[in-house]
A protein has these predicted regions:
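A C-terminal functional module that forms or caps the active site or interfaces directly
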Residues: 1-91
């Protein structure tokens, strides 16, 4: 599958706590926010990544905050895709 570049902005964070903090900031700015976090389940993350980004676009989400997985194995591939999605939406 080609790299999907969502219409919403994608921001990357290291931890769920960082995601919650950033969500609070964005919600206070009247942004519609979704957190993308699979709690360390990289297989589910990989399988659902593009579907969740498309769903965010269809739901009118302004910003997706993605908790990035560890940079090993499948996690590395997910990080690469999220980095590309983030770069494409933060120009």
């Amino acid at each position: 599958e080609k790299h999907y570049a969502p219409n919403c902005r994608v921001e990357l964070v290291e931890t769920a706590a960082d995601a919650k903090r950033r969500q609070s900031e964005l919600v206070s700015e009247n942004q519609k926010v979704q957190i993308l976090d699979f709690l360390g389940d990289v297989v589910s993350y990989a399988n659902q990544l593009y579907a969740r980004l498309r769903q965010a676009d269809q739901s009118g989400i302004d910003v997706v905050i993605a908790v990035i997985p560890i940079n090993v194995g499948l996690g590395e591939a997910i990080r690469d895709r999220l980095t590309k999605a983030s770069a494409a939406t933060n120009l």
